[in-house]
């Protein structure tokens, strides 16, 4: 019997460490999805480097307490799956939100974004943000705009002087 308890303690430690280490964690209710839909969801999450696992709620509750994320205990009812991402904050929210739009059975319940418990609305707002690369390209274009405008103004002045001199 003690080996079963030891195994459960290891699982609780694993969940707690994933909750602490991941940049983004999303809890979803997958009830109503068939096997092929869950397989497709897992494939999409794997492609985004997101780990997707189903744990018992009692073990998840203990891990949540260890990770000091007590705000999640309210959503740990019914069948839940957890998506962990250690690389990208936006990736799990984006993939799960897109999948939920096409499959009404998938319900986003809550999340942990950079160590802070987040509501469904916050997770969905995060999902609507562009990816990191998209944000960087937007920033780059904003930074380039003044230089580009200066170059265009200098060219216009040069063209005007050239016309006057001709």
Curated annotation (Swiss-Prot):
Chain's role: Forms part of the ribosomal stalk, playing a central role in the interaction of the ribosome with GTP-bound translation factors.
Family statement drawn from the similarity comment of this UniProt entry: Belongs to the universal ribosomal protein uL10 family.
GO biological process terms held by the UniProt record: translation
Record keywords: Ribonucleoprotein, Ribosomal protein, RNA-binding, rRNA-binding
MF terms (GO), sorted A to Z: large ribosomal subunit rRNA binding; structural constituent of ribosome
Gene: rplJ
Pfam families registered for this protein in UniProt: Ribosomal_L10
Assembly and interaction partners: Part of the ribosomal stalk of the 50S ribosomal subunit. The N-terminus interacts with L11 and the large rRNA to form the base of the stalk. The C-terminus forms an elongated spine to which L12 dimers bind in a sequential fashion forming a multimeric L10(L12)X complex.
PROSITE patterns per UniProt: RIBOSOMAL_L10
Top-rank lineage group of the source organism: Bacteria
Cross-referenced SUPFAM superfamilies: Ribosomal protein L10-like (SSF160369)
Protein name: Large ribosomal subunit protein uL10
The keyword Ribosomal protein is assigned to this record: yes
Any one annotated GO CC term: large ribosomal subunit
């Amino acid at each position: 019997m003690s080996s079963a308890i030891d195994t459960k303690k290891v699982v609780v430690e694993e969940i707690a460490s994933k909750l602490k280490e991941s940049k983004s964690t999303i809890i979803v209710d997958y009830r109503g999805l068939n096997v092929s839909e869950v397989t497709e969801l897992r494939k999409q999450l794997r492609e985004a480097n997101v780990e997707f696992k189903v744990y018992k709620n009692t073990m998840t509750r203990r891990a949540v307490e260890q990770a000091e994320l007590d705000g999640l205990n309210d959503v740990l009812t019914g069948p839940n799956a957890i998506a962990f991402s250690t690389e990208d904050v936006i990736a799990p929210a984006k993939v799960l939100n897109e999948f939920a739009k096409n499959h009404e059975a998938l319900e986003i319940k809550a999340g942990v974004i950079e160590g802070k418990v987040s509501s469904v609305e916050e997770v969905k707002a995060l999902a609507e943000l562009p990816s990191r690369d998209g944000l960087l390209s937007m920033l780059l274009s904003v930074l380039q705009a003044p230089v580009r405008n200066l170059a265009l103004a200098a060219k216009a002045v040069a063209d005007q002087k050239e016309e006057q001199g001709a």
